[in-house]
């Protein structure tokens, strides 16, 4: 019986001469026949690259045997063995080529070469051979190398023995005994490690016996052998659960004494796989944290943290006491490492350690403010604020302290971070009503130093919605009045400008009265004078004046009248609420009068020339509406009804909307983070009893590390193991018609980075098709690895070929080709054109999630945009959104509660997806119902870093329309 062997691994080789014209076979032959060793080396490199690109170069085999194989040059010999790896060793009938007999003799001589490096390189080459006819002649020489004096030879010899046995057991029927004997007698650690790996794969009982014999000395063994022991224990414990407890004790001892980083990581990982005991998990994860702190490679840090996150998800609640230890990783400079550590710590925070965590994060936040000039300091600060926000919302006891902490830093934060702080304050005042009074007091005290208009608008909304008592309303009003500054704004600013102009004129007159001519310094030299000094001084003066202005006045004079419109709404809310909670009519009238004065002053200054940008129509309309509400003196019979409508619009509706949105978001977060949801099982899932089940591998949980390895190799295809036959039937594409002389169909299998075409060819004629071959070519970022070789197909015969197409991006790709075979009786070759195969873009696009800040950053950074106008006869806006999500495979970032009701007439949302190649795709949907035609009209804007992905997704939107026959799409 032939042992199962792994498929060969391929190496990606960079071709440095892609733009040059490739050499012909004759040129290669001439270079090998008459060139020097250096010329032969360059020729061999080009030959290897050419063969790896799909051209087998069969004419070169004899020339290489004649002119390269006898050479003594070490570099040439190394390239020669690379050539032996990839050269076709079998003919079309599947038999060994005659030329390979000469190659076998040369390999045997190298196995007996006095140079140990040549022997070792030759033995390593044997591990890559899969032809029993070739290996059969190498067995005696390979066994002789097991006793060679140099360990470099022996370490490859034992691997060659293992490889030969896996290819064909009858070549080395006693391989298990050979490896076991070699292991017992060997002293070199690398050789012992290779031998033990081979023994554990072929003979589990002897490997276990060797492990038991060395248990007492395991702490002093070489790290390579220790790692091999850990690998064996991890796999064997899954197959023999009865030994798990003993294995765990052994691994704990090894974990405590191991010094090599690799052994520590592998041992800790094995413990977390074999045991769910909290004590064991804490010891293992503690070692992993120490490793993440100690190593300098950021990739290693992220790998270790990923493993810790997986452990925490599989064992919720077991790692809580390690929260502060994980935060030690924040000493790293890489933002991705810090983000991963904070994400894990967020899941581990409890009421017992919350205060310590907040204190540590506070120190980190202070450090970012002190080291503000450092690169990525602002990104890290935003990350810390986001983490602190998430913690405070969960724990009421520290929410007030955290609000005060973040408001203390708001002056030093950029616009995005400051807006995040205000959004957090908004959540806290809604979630914890008992803290509102103190939070409003702190907020009002810190608003004077806020420089971000967006953050200030959020603060105004908070003041308008949550100032509910008479004293709170008056405090908020005082701040607004101080923030506006002296009013009327226009007259005050003009007065200040005239005063400043007078001072400048006086200074000019004084300078004019001074003696003209050069200025002589005390040392007798002439002083220099900057011709631009006066203009620079003017700019500095204006900048200082702008900074000294209060916030609202600065925003208004800067042309930010959107903030002014928010101020107008806030003033109306404060007046209406004061009217409800207070009976002091004089104070109410004073508030109305002062509010009118502020709003009218803003409109007047917005229409003047002293602002940087005049007021826009929308903002002016909103401010005018607020003025009309404050001046309302309508019919007393209608005043109660109108007042009720105003109260609903300004005091109840917006707050109720925010509260509903907040509750919905909270429910969504709780549902997503629920441990029950993460570890749920089907209600009808069968219960497995180990003592009653048959001795097969189907009931045993797999090795998590091996599963991760399969995911890395095959991508998401490794997950989809169910209904393989059904899924393959859906992927069959006809390449020719039934009336063609050759019928062809392809089964398309999509992997993470390639597409495999399994093509079935049927000769429908009564003649033998000679020199029959299939040729494929591609359009787009696709590349054919190798076209299938020519063959002969008998009448009504079948032939199968497999073609691998490498995919390097998520752009639309097309595979086309033809079938060529010789015509009969001296006729020309005949062709059959194949149908085009379109690579499905959706196989490489996956829905993803990101925060609003990252989405906006990418939206501004990406330069390629595809804007598509939409007209649809679908019944609702949500129906079109569902079709778009289904067709583009993108995820919606906008919260569900913000999308509106099912019968809404306007819908705007953001969508996001990532490709298997790390490409980001952003989309913005903005649609509405046309009041005349009741059709869905609007735009879809798609942005990406590269042009191809944006165009491909745009084509996908158009394709959805054609398939649906309900949507009419036009490109802009």
Curated annotation (Swiss-Prot):
InterPro entries linked to this entry: ARM-like (IPR011989), ARM-type_fold (IPR016024), Clathrin/coatomer_adapt-like_N (IPR002553), Coatomer_bsu_C (IPR011710), COPB1 (IPR016460), COPB1_appendage_platform_dom (IPR029446)
Bilayer disposition of the protein: Peripheral membrane protein
GO biological process: endoplasmic reticulum to Golgi vesicle-mediated transport; intra-Golgi vesicle-mediated transport; intracellular mRNA localization; intracellular protein transport
Disulfide pairings: none
Keywords, ordered alphabetically: Cytoplasm, Cytoplasmic vesicle, ER-Golgi transport, Golgi apparatus, Membrane, Protein transport, Repeat, Transport
Chain positions covered by the region annotation Disordered: 494-522
Cellular component terms per the entry's GO annotation: COPI vesicle coat; Golgi membrane
GO MF: structural molecule activity
Repeat region (HEAT), residues: 79-113, 133-170, 317-354, 397-434, 481-518
Cell compartments where the protein resides: Cytoplasm; Golgi apparatus membrane; Cytoplasmic vesicle, COPI-coated vesicle membrane
UniProt key word GTP-binding: no
Coiled-coil segments on the chain, per record: none
Major localization listed first in the record, in broad terms: cytoplasm
Source organism superkingdom: Eukaryota
Gene3D superfamilies: Leucine-rich Repeat Variant (1.25.10.10)
Primary role: The coatomer is a cytosolic protein complex that binds to dilysine motifs and reversibly associates with Golgi non-clathrin-coated vesicles, which further mediate biosynthetic protein transport from the ER, via the Golgi up to the trans Golgi network. Coatomer complex is required for budding from Golgi membranes, and is essential for the retrograde Golgi-to-ER transport of dilysine-tagged proteins.
Subunit structure: Oligomeric complex that consists of at least the alpha, beta, beta', gamma, delta, epsilon and zeta subunits.
Protein name: Coatomer subunit beta
Organism whose genome encodes this protein: Candida glabrata (strain ATCC 2001 / BCRC 20586 / JCM 3761 / NBRC 0622 / NRRL Y-65 / CBS 138)
């Amino acid at each position: 019986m032939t042992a199962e062997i792994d498929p060969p691994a391929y190496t990606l080789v960079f071709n440095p001469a892609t733009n040059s014209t490739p050499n012909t076979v004759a040129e290669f032959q001439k270079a090998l026949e008459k060139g020097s060793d250096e010329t032969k080396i360059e020729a061999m490199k080009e030959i290897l690259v050419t063969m790896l690109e799909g051209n087998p170069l069969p004419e070169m085999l004899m020339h290489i045997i004649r002119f390269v194989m006898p050479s003594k040059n070490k570099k040439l010999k190394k390239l020669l063995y690379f050539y032996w790896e990839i050269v076709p060793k079998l003919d079309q009938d599947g038999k060994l080529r005659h030329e390979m007999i000469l190659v076998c003799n040369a390999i045997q001589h190298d196995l007996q070469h006095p140079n140990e490096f040549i022997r070792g390189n030759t033995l390593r080459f044997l591990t890559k051979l899969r032809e029993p006819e070739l290996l059969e002649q190498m067995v005696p020489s390979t066994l002789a190398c097991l006793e060679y004096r140099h360990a470099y030879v022996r370490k490859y010899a034992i691997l060659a023995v293992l490889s030969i046995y896996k290819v064909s057991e009858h070549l080395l029927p006693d391989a298990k005994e050979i490896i076991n004997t070699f292991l017992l007698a060997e002293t070199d650690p690398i050789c012992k490690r290779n031998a033990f790996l081979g023994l554990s794969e072929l003979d589990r009982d002897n490997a276990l016996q060797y492990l038991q014999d060395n248990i007492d000395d395991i702490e002093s063994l070489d790290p390579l052998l220790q790692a091999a022991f850990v690998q064996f224990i991890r796999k064997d414990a899954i197959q023999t659960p009865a030994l798990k407890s003993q294995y765990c004790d052994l691994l704990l001892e090894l974990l405590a004494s191991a010094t090599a980083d690799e052994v520590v990581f592998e041992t800790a990982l094995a413990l977390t796989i074999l045991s769910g005991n909290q004590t064991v998990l804490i010891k293992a994860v503690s070692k992993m944290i120490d490793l993440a702190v100690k190593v300098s490679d950021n990739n290693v840090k992220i790998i270790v943290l990923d493993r810790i996150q997986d452990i925490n998800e599989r064992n919720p609640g077991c790692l809580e006491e390690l929260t502060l230890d994980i935060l030690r990783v924040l000493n790293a400079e890489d933002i991705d490492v810090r983000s991963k550590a904070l994400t894990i710590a967020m899941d581990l925070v409890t009421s017992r350690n919350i205060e310590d965590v907040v204190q540590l994060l506070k120190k980190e936040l202070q450090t970012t403010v002190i080291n503000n000039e450092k690169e990525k300091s602002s990104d890290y600060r935003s990350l810390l604020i986001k983490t602190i926000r998430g913690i405070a919302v969960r724990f009421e006891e520290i929410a007030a302290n955290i609000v005060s902490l973040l408001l203390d830093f708001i002056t030093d934060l950029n616009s995005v971070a400051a807006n995040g702080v205000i959004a957090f304050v908004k959540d806290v005042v809604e979630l914890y009503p008992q803290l509102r009074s103190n939070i409003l007091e702190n907020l009002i005290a810190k608003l004077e130093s806020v420089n971000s208009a967006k953050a200030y608008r959020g603060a105004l909304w908070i003041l308008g919605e949550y100032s509910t008592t008479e004293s709170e309303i008056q405090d908020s009003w005082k701040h607004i009045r101080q923030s506006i500054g002296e009013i009327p704004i226009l007259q005050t600013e003009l007065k200040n400008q005239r005063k400043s102009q007078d001072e400048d004129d006086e200074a000019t007159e004084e300078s004019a009265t001074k003696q003209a001519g050069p200025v002589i310094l005390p040392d007798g030299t002439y002083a220099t004078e900057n011709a631009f000094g006066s203009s620079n001084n003017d700019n500095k003066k204006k900048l200082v004046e702008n900074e000294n202005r209060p916030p609202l006045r600065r925003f208004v004079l800067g042309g930010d009248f959107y903030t002014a419109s928010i101020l107008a709404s806030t003033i109306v809310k404060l007046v209406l609420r004061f009217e409800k909670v207070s009976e002091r009519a004089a104070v109410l009238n004073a508030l109305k009068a002062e509010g009118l004065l502020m709003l009218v002053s803003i409109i007047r200054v917005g229409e003047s020339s002293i602002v940087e940008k005049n007021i826009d129509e929308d903002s002016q309309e909103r401010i005018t509406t607020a003025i009309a509400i404050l001046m309302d003196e309508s019919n007393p019979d209608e005043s109660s009804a109108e007042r009720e409508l105003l109260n609903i619009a300004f005091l109840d509706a917006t707050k109720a909307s925010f509260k509903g949105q907040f509750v919905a978001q909270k429910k969504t977060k709780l549902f997503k983070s629920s441990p029950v949801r993460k570890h749920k099982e089907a209600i009808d899932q069968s219960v497995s009893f180990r003592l009653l089940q048959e001795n097969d591998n189907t009931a045993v949980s797999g090795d998590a590390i091996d599963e991760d390895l399969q995911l890395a190799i095959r991508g998401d295809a490794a997950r989809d193991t169910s209904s393989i036959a059904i899924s393959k039937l859906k992927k069959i594409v006809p390449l020719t018609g039934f009336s063609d002389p050759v019928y062809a169909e392809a089964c398309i299998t999509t992997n993470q980075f390639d597409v495999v075409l399994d093509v079935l060819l049927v000769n429908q004629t009564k003649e033998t098709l000679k020199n029959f071959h299939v040729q494929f070519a591609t359009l787009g970022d696709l590349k054919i690895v190798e076209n299938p070789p020519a063959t002969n197909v008998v009448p009504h015969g079948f032939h199968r070929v497999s073609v691998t197409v490498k995919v390097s991006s998520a752009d639309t790709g097309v595979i086309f080709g033809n079938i060529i075979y010789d015509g009969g009786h001296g006729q020309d070759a005949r062709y059959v054109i194949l149908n085009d195969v379109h690579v499905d873009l959706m196989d490489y696009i996956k829905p993803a999630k990101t925060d609003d800040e990252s989405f906006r950053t990418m939206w501004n950074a990406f330069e390629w945009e595809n804007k598509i106008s939409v007209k649809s006869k679908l019944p609702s806006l949500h129906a079109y959104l569902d079709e778009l999500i289904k067709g583009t495979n993108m995820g919606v970032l906008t919260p569900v509660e913000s999308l509106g009701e099912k019968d809404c007439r306007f819908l705007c949302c953001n969508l996001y997806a990532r490709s298997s190649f790390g490409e980001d795709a952003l989309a913005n949907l903005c649609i509405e119902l046309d009041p005349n035609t009741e059709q869905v009209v609007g735009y879809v804007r798609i942005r990406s870093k590269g042009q191809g992905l944006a165009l491909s997704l745009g084509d996908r939107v158009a394709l959805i329309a054609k398939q649906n026959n309900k949507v009419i799409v036009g490109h802009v």
